[in-house]
Amino acid sequence: MPEISVIMPVHNVERFVADAVRSVLEQTFENFELLIIDDCSPDASIAICETFDDPRIRIVRHTVNRGLAGARNTGVRHAKGELLAFLDSDDCWLPGKLEQHMAHLQARPEVGVSFSRSAFIGEDGTPNHCYQMPRLTDIEPGYFLCRNPIGNGSAPVIRRAVFDDIRYIADFLGSFEDWYFDEHLRRSEDIECWIRIALTTDWLIEGIPEPLTLYRLNAGGLSAQLFKQLESWEQVIEKTRGYAPDFVAKWERPARAYQLRYLARQAIRLQDGSAAVQLVNRAFRTEPRILLQEPTRTILTVGAAYLLHLVPQSLYATIENRAQRLIGNAQAWRIERDMGSRIS
């Protein structure tokens, strides 16, 4: 029986999926199964997956496209392991990821969700030398609404018992199923799940300092998707309001400002200066105190948005490259410090 079930939704990722599968098969912890969820992928993604000859791989096929939430739900229902790890099929893991999360969860039985920091990579897999640097411990529910410390869907490893605690029954095409992620959400479904875990269970959510997830920056998205993502986030707010109205009343305004700031950074990555400026301005109108609460990140976001909007692209690229090197070096130093503290 596998100790860990790795759940990988697959849809239209033929350029990246082989790297994702290899990163799982190369794990130093070997007692796992890899559940590849074919979400009606129209390209050669599944054919590529079928070229891997490893008995730990199982392919589960959908008859209709259900999105990330639906694919993850299918994976949870089929999983045999007591720990469930999630990997988006355009991302990758470093070889020690599963081993380190297993050790973390064994050492901390009160932790239900273990996540890692993530390193950014380009579409071609080249390291970006910058990292997602979330808070790792003492994470209150409001922090999930404001900043989503888990960061991306390829970072967490979660106990099955956590999903047992948040399971609910939903009607899908006339058939009742166990749901864990909300399939009504095509975006922000992971944030909604983490908030529900934080608010409705006693499990702790903690991170480990190593950047064990490689998070691919895919420029194929359109800036219009940013505003659809904001709409999905608003749906998360309304769902949460239904069972935790006092919590939402306290956190809604600052959380919306942080979400707008996050989307501004996404617009910057998409090289859309106009959208970035619009989003940072909305963030400040919503809650000016984000400048006092997180001055460095907020100032960097505002500066990048206006530079991208106002200066020639070649000059902006030069400034951005230098800034990324400085930020990446500072982040790498902090990671080394945190890893040393953890070992000692």
Predicted regions and their residues:
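N-proximal low-complexity "stem/linker" segments adjacent to membrane-targeting elements
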Residues: 1-25
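C-terminal subregions of glycosyltransferases and related glycan-biosynthesis enzymes
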Residues: 1, 199, 210-344
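Glycine-rich, basic loop-to-helix element that forms the pyrophosphate-binding segment
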Residues: 62-79, 89, 100
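Conserved nucleotide-sugar donor-binding catalytic segment
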Residues: 77, 134-231
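A conserved acidic beta->alpha catalytic loop
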Residues: 23, 38-47, 64, 88
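Cell-envelope/extracellular polymer assembly enzymes that use nucleotide-activated donors
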Residues: 2-5, 33, 192
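Short aromatic/hydrophobic "clamp" motif used to bind/position activated sugar donors
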Residues: 84
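Conserved donor NDP-sugar-binding/catalytic core segment of glycosyltransferases
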Residues: 96-130
